Swiss-Prot record:
It is found in: Nucleus. Residues 156-165, 272-287 have a biased composition (Basic and acidic residues). It holds the Pfam family RSRP. This is Arginine/serine-rich protein 1. Residues 1-131, 156-175, 217-296 are annotated as: Disordered. Residues 20-31 have a biased composition (Low complexity). The keyword Amino-acid biosynthesis does not apply. The gene is RSRP1.
Amino acid sequence: MSNYVNDMWPGSPQEKDSPSASRSGGSSRLSSRSRSRSFSRSSRSRSRVSSRFSSRSRSRSRRSRSRSRSRRRHQRKYRRYSRSYSRSRSRSRSRRYRERRYGFSRRYYRSPSRSRSRSRSRSRSRSRERSYYGRAYAMARGRRYYGFGRTVYPEERSRWRDRSRTRSRSRTPFRLSEKDRMELLEIAKANAAKALGTTNIDLPASLRTVHVAKETSHGIGVSSNGAKPELSENVTEDGPRNPSEKPSQQRSIAFSSNNSVAKPIQKSAKAATEETSSRSPKIDKKKSPYGLWIPV
């Protein structure tokens, strides 16, 4: 009985050597192996997933970089009128002009590289200082600011043809003929008569209608009757005489023993009036529109 109890007791050697114990040990070994295999599989799957995520992140970063580059290229088209871009273009143009004008190489005019570690406050203060002058320059050049004065876009140039449809499209100045001028003068006379309530208005000499004599190829004026007008002393057949030229007259000079200075002989008033009357041009009052002109 005691042997039976000892055999059935949990700490007995029979239990250790029993097949059930060996089976439990083998199952534990199998479970540990399966656990290690599953752990290795899970680690492999995790590594694969992490590699996939890393590859995806790399592809995303590459895509974002390409997109940012494309955006930058696209924005360069619209940065054409920005202040910084215009300054760089003006500087490059000035350098090119100096090189072409004086034949210097670029290394003498190459400015030192600007450090990118400038603070934003410094750049903002400079932009605020120059904003007023930049805006005034842009308004003078016909441009308009957008977005807090950062970007400048050119205004559409309104052509002079689009301003009013009544203007003629030809750029040559509009000239009136003599007939049109006479018609406009008659219309102005009629309007003035209606406004003042008078029928007959005495116009000044500058506004009176004058029949201009037709000039022939010889330069002689011919009136409407066909009569040849008389030529005055100032106008000769060869051409008009210069009024500044005085007629050469030889005056008799009187000498006296008391005074050594030569003096011309004074003529009488009657002889002087006869000379002036002979010098004055013969003008017909009926033919000339301005009447008789008295020489001063």
